[in-house]
Amino acid sequence: MAKTAMAYKEKMKELSMLSLICSCFYPEPRNMNIYKYDDMEVKQINKRASGQAFELILKPPSPVSEAPRTLASPKKKELSLEEIQKKLEAAEERRKSQEAQVLKHLAEKREHEREVLQKALEENNNFSKMAEEKLILKMEQIKENREANLAALIERLQEKERHAAEVRRNKELQVELSG
């Protein structure tokens, strides 16, 4: 079946190339409604505005077709005990090497994870210190502003008190002068 499919693909390639070549030699379309090959036949059904339609008829494979050949594997030679031992040792070395490589990879991965965690802790500590410093600075600024506002308020109250005392004194002087 696979051989038939391959032959079909090849014939279709040839068909399109044949059509191309024919159109070069014969600019006017030829009236070839049937193309015949060894194991297939192509009939043109009708022409359409969107393209052409074909009917493809595959002939059954001939009874003399070649049976799929299986390649015989080369005969294995007998291995000696030394050769078997060498192969086993080589396999053991490969296994150990692969194991060492996996362990190395895991160690590198753990080291990377440790570095990432260390960096995250440092950044967190730096952020905490910066936030604490900003908070202390802000609290100091708020305290200074509060003290300045209180001093200004006390100054205004003292000024009002002096003014009130002066007004009382002036009133007493007026009462004494008028009385």
Curated annotation (Swiss-Prot):
Residues 39-96 are annotated as: Regulatory/phosphorylation domain. It is a peripheral membrane protein. Disulfide bonds: none annotated. The modification Phosphoserine is found at S16, S50, S62, S73, S80, S97. It holds the Pfam family Stathmin. The keyword Coiled coil applies. One of its GO terms (biological process) is microtubule depolymerization. Residues 74-179 form a coiled coil. Residues 1-26 are annotated as: Membrane attachment. PANTHER family: STATHMIN (PTHR10104), STATHMIN-2 (PTHR10104:SF18). This is Stathmin-2. It comes from Gallus gallus.
